[in-house]
């Protein structure tokens, strides 16, 4: 039996990783990309492959002082520098300082004809020369597909890519090599062989879900080391690629026993003294049941106590929100003038869910609020899959809890009267407190009802109470004690005789349980 060979230099080390400092990538890769190895980044057109390759080099040079080499087969060095400048990355200064070298291997615009045996010997030698001359530690190659687009023989492609990868490994550089694929969920790469000669494979996707594009990243393999499995959404911002590693989030947030007021005294009593600080509250109900009013009272109460608050509105404009709040005696404009309130209004269709999530996180990070509200979640759910929407809600709630912020969200149900589910997207388990608002028909008149459907970690009132809206705002009255089946949407009045009979039966049961 063969025994493992020993080295005089000490024990064999495992795969070392180099941090990329790309937001979220180090989390899903469990520490970064494997050092001294090549990572294949594959994706269709417009997925962000070139951007990832440039950002990887730029961060390595700026944060770790690793010299870098960028090999381009498609764009000119001028275009690459100009495009990177849009993200605030000054590649030209790095080139002038000798920290970055851009090797132009783009094809002749007049075209080339392949004659004889095809190989990359000359190109590999050019890359090796540049690596040694500039002492490069990081290399990005964009993209190998352009090299082989005139030569479709898979065995030749596999052989030449293997030679290139082997030479890069011999030179001990950490490299990214981009390649194109034809379908989002088809073969990993165009020629079907690239992934087999690479130690690491990352797939970028840009999928049309409903009416919106959704970018995701998946680490298919990192040979010899661990990584997170599955697809993770990402967006492209002014700072580059931003990945949301929702699966990397841990349920380690602190929980506070402190209570905060909802702004409605009776609702505070129904919740055992108010909402828990850093909890997530969901108000769900049909349109017009008073969800936005509860949100407005919640924000007003925070500002009255000198706390900062943000309202992310996706159904009403700033002017409309201010006008409606004013009719309830709430002055949003005065709160904004004092710097306590921020109203951010936009259409849900103006951006993808990942872009909305990034905007929410950025605004929270900048404004530092104690309370946030989203009105409404159901507007954001339009035109996206349930899984994508649930990931968005997890991202928002997780970040709010991490920052110890109390969140109040609304959800509009399709059911006008009665209720079959709390939300259509099954996000109720993510929230801590659920307020159910609905219409009920009592004696030929339409009334509103409210009840605390759920509240984690606290006693709460189980009654279904009447909820009225007037110029003074919200008022919660007594329970509908003489009615049953209100939640089902078919309230039935309990007759006095029936109540007496029930009382008689209960007294009889109690008498039987008394000792003789």
UniProtKB/Swiss-Prot annotation:
It comes from the Bacteria. Keywords: ATP-binding, Biological rhythms, Hydrolase, Kinase, Magnesium, Metal-binding, Nucleotide-binding, Phosphoprotein, Repeat, Serine/threonine-protein kinase, Transcription, Transcription regulation, Transferase. Mg(2+) 1 binds at residue 50. The interaction with KaiA enhances its phosphorylation status, while the interaction with KaiB decreases it. ATP 1 binds at residues 46-51, 86, 221-223, 225, 227, 237. Phosphorylated on serine and threonine residues by autocatalysis. Has a 4 step phosphorylation cycle; the autokinase acts first on Thr-429, then Ser-428. When Ser-428 is modified KaiC switches to an autophosphatase mode, acting first on phospho-Thr-429 then phospho-Ser-428. It catalyses: L-seryl-[protein] + ATP = O-phospho-L-seryl-[protein] + ADP + H(+); L-threonyl-[protein] + ATP = O-phospho-L-threonyl-[protein] + ADP + H(+); ATP + H2O = ADP + phosphate + H(+). Its cofactor is Mg(2+). One of its GO terms (molecular function) is ATP hydrolysis activity. Binds 2 Mg(2+) ions per subunit, one in each domain. Mg(2+) is required for hexamerization and phosphatase activity. The keyword Cell cycle does not apply. Disulfide bonds: none annotated. This is Circadian clock oscillator protein KaiC. It comes from Picosynechococcus sp. (strain ATCC 27264 / PCC 7002 / PR-6) (Agmenellum quadruplicatum).
């Amino acid at each position: 039996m063969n025994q493992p060979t020993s080295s005089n230099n000490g024990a064999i080390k495992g795969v070392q990783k180099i941090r990329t400092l790309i937001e979220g990538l180090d989390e899903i890769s469990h520490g970064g990309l494997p050092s001294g190895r090549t990572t294949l980044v594959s994706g269709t057109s417009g997925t962000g492959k070139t951007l990832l390759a440039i950002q990887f080099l730029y961060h390595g040079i700026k944060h770790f002082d690793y010299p870098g080499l960028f090999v381009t087969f498609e764009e000119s060095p001028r275009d690459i520098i100009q495009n990177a400048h849009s993200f605030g990355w000054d590649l030209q200064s790095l080139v002038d300082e000798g920290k970055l070298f851009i090797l132009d291997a783009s094809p002749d615009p007049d075209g080339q004809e392949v004659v004889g045996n095809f190989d990359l010997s000359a190109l590999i030698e050019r890359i090796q020369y540049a690596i040694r001359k500039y002492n490069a530690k990081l290399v990005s190659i964009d993209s190998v597909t352009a090299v082989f687009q005139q030569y479709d023989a898979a065995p030749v492609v596999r052989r030449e890519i293997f030679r290139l990868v082997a030479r890069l490994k011999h030179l001990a550089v950490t490299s990214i090599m981009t390649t194109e694929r034809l379908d989002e969920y088809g073969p990993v790469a165009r020629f079907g062989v690239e992934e087999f000669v690479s130690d690491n494979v990352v797939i970028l996707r840009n999928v049309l879900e409903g009416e919106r594009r959704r970018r995701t990243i998946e680490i298919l393999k990192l040979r010899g080391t661990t990584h997170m499995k599955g697809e993770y959404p990402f967006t492209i911002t002014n700072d580059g690629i931003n990945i949301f590693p929702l699966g990397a989030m841990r349920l380690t947030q602190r929980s506070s026993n402190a209570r905060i007021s909802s702004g409605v005294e009776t609702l505070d009593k129904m919740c055992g003294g108010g909402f828990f600080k850093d909890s997530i509250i969901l108000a769900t109900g049909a349109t017009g049941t008073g969800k936005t009013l509860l949100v407005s009272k919640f924000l007003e109460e925070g500002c009255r106590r000198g706390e900062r608050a943000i309202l992310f509105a996706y159904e009403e404009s700033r002017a409309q929100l201010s006008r409606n709040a004013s009719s309830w005696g709430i002055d949003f404009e005065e709160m904004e003038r004092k710097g306590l309130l921020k109203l951010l209004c936009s259409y849900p269709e103006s951006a993808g869910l990942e872009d909305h999530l990034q905007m929410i996180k950025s605004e929270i990070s900048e404004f530092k609020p104690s309370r946030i509200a989203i009105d409404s979640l159901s507007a954001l759910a339009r035109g996206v899959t349930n899984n994508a929407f649930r990931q968005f809600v997890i991202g928002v709630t997780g970040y709010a809890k991490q920052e110890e912020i109390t969140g109040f969200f609304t959800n509009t149900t399709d059911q006008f009267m009665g209720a079959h589910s709390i939300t259509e997207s099954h996000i109720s388990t993510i929230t801590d407190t659920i307020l159910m608002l609905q219409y009920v028909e009592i004696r030929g008149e339409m009334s509103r009802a409210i009840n605390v459907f759920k509240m984690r970690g606290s006693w709460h009132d189980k009654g279904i109470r009447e909820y009225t809206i007037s110029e003074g705002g919200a008022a919660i009255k007594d329970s509908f004690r003489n009615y049953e089946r209100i939640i089902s949407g078919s309230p039935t009045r309990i007759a006095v005789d029936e109540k007496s009979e029930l009382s008689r039966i209960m007294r009889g049961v109690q008498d039987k349980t008394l000792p003789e």
